[in-house]
Amino acid sequence: MIKAGIIGGAGYTAGELIRLLINHPDVDIKFINSSSNAGNKITDVHEGLYGETDLVFTDELPLDEIDVLFFCTAHGDTKKFMDSHNVPEDLKIIDLSMDYRIKSDDHDFIYGLPELNRRAICHSKHVANPGCFATCIQLGLLPLAKHLLLNEDIMVNAITGSTGAGVKPGATSHFSWRNNNMSIYKPFSHQHVPEIKQSLKQLQNSFNAEIDFIPYRGDFPRGIFATLVVKCKVELEELVKMYQDYYAEDSFVHIVDKNIDLKQVVNTNKCLIHLEKHGDKLLVISCIDNLLKGASGQAVHNMNLMFNLEETVGLRLKPSAF
């Protein structure tokens, strides 16, 4: 059994990660660290786990007793922890924050998008889980980058559920504001754009276009629905074949020949992609569950690869659908 520890156990991504690991046939959770909830039952915070676990939050960190450590911490906290603690050299680490997503000589974390870096993830000890918007958008663009087709600016509109803002209440996550409402935030300046550009340049070294990304807040709890518009003269049939070939060995990305919607992916680790051609413009529609494929599900996917397991173990999940 893989012995797992979690640091930062009270948020939405941690709750989903705990749910996945409890039901994973090859994992035993040894501890869930939360300084604000130490001594409380997991079900005091994650009430959806009633009847599934008797685990209790702890403020202890028995790092020598585990094989893999997940960070579900606020941005900046993972780096602080790594800089201030003596972490066992053979301990595998999966960081769900943005601290190590950008390549640097200062760290050895691999960017954890399996559809881009599968082989490197399999041989890595340290993996930086991608952002939720970044995952959804990259999966819609990677096949184009591989074929060197991203030569003009890319227009992206993407709407996310309220869980994307985290568990801590705020003015824009309050029900009376969010319900029956929509708004944009961080237009052209979202923090996920640099990691998207980094990945596209990895496949298409000449990539130097702008990503004009407008994020939207949706009035639903979970999911990301993104539309990407790219100028492209290649015929639709050939483009569909490019996407199918690119994702042929990937279990969680599916090219669909008709319109897609969030209910087909919410509660799963899937990404669905639909393509349409309008003159010289290619419309790519990509949708995921922000808490699973965009966070905790992808983290478990990375863990499976790092421990040489079949990649879908513990991740065969039914979508909400209706």
From Swiss-Prot:
It catalyses: N-acetyl-L-glutamate 5-semialdehyde + phosphate + NADP(+) = N-acetyl-L-glutamyl 5-phosphate + NADPH + H(+). Keywords: Amino-acid biosynthesis, Arginine biosynthesis, Cytoplasm, NADP, Oxidoreductase. One of its GO terms (cellular component) is cytoplasm. Gene3D superfamilies: Dihydrodipicolinate Reductase, domain 2, NAD(P)-binding Rossmann-like Domain. Its EC number is 1.2.1.38. Pathway: Amino-acid biosynthesis; L-arginine biosynthesis; N(2)-acetyl-L-ornithine from L-glutamate: step 3/4. GO terms for molecular function: N-acetyl-gamma-glutamyl-phosphate reductase activity; NAD binding; NADP+ binding. GO terms for biological process: L-arginine biosynthetic process. The active site is at residue 132. The keyword NADP applies. It holds the Pfam family Semialdhyde_dh. Its main location: cytoplasm. SMART domains: Semialdhyde_dh (SM00859). It is found in: Cytoplasm. Catalyzes the NADPH-dependent reduction of N-acetyl-5-glutamyl phosphate to yield N-acetyl-L-glutamate 5-semialdehyde. PANTHER family: N-ACETYL-GAMMA-GLUTAMYL-PHOSPHATE REDUCTASE, CHLOROPLASTIC-RELATED, N-ACETYL-GAMMA-GLUTAMYL-PHOSPHATE REDUCTASE, CHLOROPLASTIC-RELATED-RELATED. Belongs to the NAGSA dehydrogenase family. Type 1 subfamily. This is N-acetyl-gamma-glutamyl-phosphate reductase. The lineage of its organism: Bacteria, Pseudomonadati, Bacteroidota, Bacteroidia, Bacteroidales. The gene is argC.
